[in-house]
Swiss-Prot record:
Protein name, UniProt field: Large ribosomal subunit protein uL23
Top-level taxon in the UniProt lineage: Bacteria
GO cellular component: ribonucleoprotein complex; ribosome
Alphabetized SUPFAM superfamilies for the sequence: Ribosomal proteins S24e, L23 and L15e (SSF54189)
MF terms in GO: rRNA binding; structural constituent of ribosome
Source organism of this protein record: Finegoldia magna (strain ATCC 29328 / DSM 20472 / WAL 2508)
Record's subunit section: Part of the 50S ribosomal subunit. Contacts protein L29, and trigger factor when it is bound to the ribosome.
Family: Belongs to the universal ribosomal protein uL23 family.
Length: 96
């Protein structure tokens, strides 16, 4: 079994994710092979909160060019985690 810290890679800080925080929704970059149940358990264990729902999406890597050479960034998975109403906020995102 994977460690929760291997499943949740990093938070995604963007204008859209900051607006979702008002509704107790947080956006994370997660392991590409993780499923919703693993993501839910990892968030609950790391941040000591109750998760209401988890939405995941696979993000395709962009094609980037460097002069005549072209390459592709890696594909990755994004998870939007909604917390229950009585759950505390994730402190990591406060003050952003």
């Amino acid at each position: 079994m994977k460690s929760p810290y291997d499943i949740i890679l990093k938070p995604i800080i963007s204008e859209d994710s900051m607006e979702k925080m008002e509704d107790k929704k947080y956006v994370f970059k997660v392991d590409k092979n993780a499923n919703k149940i693993e993501i839910r358990n990892a968030i609950e264990k790391i941040f000591d909160v109750k998760v209401k729902s988890v939405n995941t999406m696979n993000v395709k890597g962009k094609v980037k060019r460097m002069g005549a050479h072209s390459g592709k960034r890696s594909d990755w998975k994004k998870a939007i985690v909604a917390l229950t109403e009585d759950s505390k906020e994730i402190e990591f995102f406060e003050g952003m």
